[in-house]
Amino acid sequence: PVLGRIKLIVHSKPGKHTPDVEYTFKDVGLKQNIPVLGLYPNYNNQITLIYTDLQGNERARSNLKLQTKTLESRRLPKEIRVVKAQYDRMEPGMNLVNSPGQDETDTSIPYMIDADGEIRWILDWEKSDEHRYIGIGCGLIRMQNGHYMTGDGNHHRMVEVDMMGNTIHNWDMLERGYTMHHAISQDKQGNILATVSKTSAKIANGKDVRINDFIIMMDPEKGEILQEWDLVHMLDSARYGMTDYDLTSDPFAQSASNWAHNNGIVEWGDDYLATARYQGIFKFNKAGGIEWIISPHGYWRDKYLKLLLNPLHADGTPITDPEVIAGTKTCDDFEWPWGCHTAVPLPNGHILYFNNGYGRNFKLDFTDRKNIYTCGIEYEVDEVNRTVRQVWQYGKERGAAYFTPARSGVQYLEQTGNRLICPGMSNVLSNGNRGARVTEVDPETQDVVFELELEDAIYQRVYRMSLYPENQ
């Protein structure tokens, strides 16, 4: 026997477009246990194991077959359809669908779908005594160590698992004074950023609990809270009630308690980029100082007006219509954030985010089909001149059938430069039924190079990623 590595190949079904799953493990021991991922359900899978020496030379190989069972879960989509695919133009990888199950209190069920619409990986927590009824409103993110991290909104924990679903860390956030909400990410130091509620925080009456208006930084190895940002000291907490007058009984409606509804946080250089469903997109520094805010100018108190960026037309000229600036009217070449999610920095310094279109122009008239649409938007921000210009969008042309009032997200795809636009609920699908979509768009041509329909399904986020972590 010699030291060496194992290369795994899970062969694709004949006639399929998804490439074989290939992965070389880093372990060089004489005895190795390897996780085999990417098996088709209800199929006699063909697997090849290649044994190499330390120089990468093949020493032997084995061909195996492994019969799998049918997936049985009421939480999976009624049907998965690939309605469009230009496989040579797509970003490589699987689509990680972060589904909450059948509702917010159900057991979440993340799964990966390949380019042919086949489920190739699933994390079935329903069979776990530890994680049954886990609520991954945050969705799984892949950490720098190759594991997954998520926030559990049902039990208010921060959970780290490996690719086989084994628990690595399970941090009780209630013990730390927080409940989980909607988004987590990892900074360049490896710390976790999370949008949370603080259990001891009250609104001005000293009675009602504030929700969804804190951001924390946590050491994922020690569970130590390293920093806390209170949005009340950063944004205008008196700016609420403009939209949801008829939804005051809804726990997710805008109110004195849920005035911000923060739902996205990422590191951006030495600063941070965040979204709040009801307040827009904002950039802040480590000390909690607001650098700027992208939001309709209506209803902000005077002391915040200097933080608001001024909108430009596509040609770079200022928008001067006071109704457009205030947000009570929309112009053809600029959209304010309405019910926004998941702002992410782009390599060119711009911002890509998901604009749900919820409460556009401060109205909640879902019968106004002309004004009901969802889109992914790219902004160019000029921090010197304090302006914001919309340079790209996709989704408005799809109309009301593409509208999703909540959840959802976007992703910049690094290899191709494509964008993943992900309306996670309430879409009218090609057969007339409701569900969710995953749309991959080439921003240079506006071509849809891939679109997936998930019938009778919802999700929080979708991410295109490799099945195995690339750095492990």
Region spans (language model):
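Solvent-exposed serine/threonine-rich low-complexity stretches and specific carbohydrate-binding patches
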Residues: 18-29
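Histidine-/acidic-rich catalytic cores in large beta-rich domains
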Residues: 2-13, 29-33, 37, 41-472
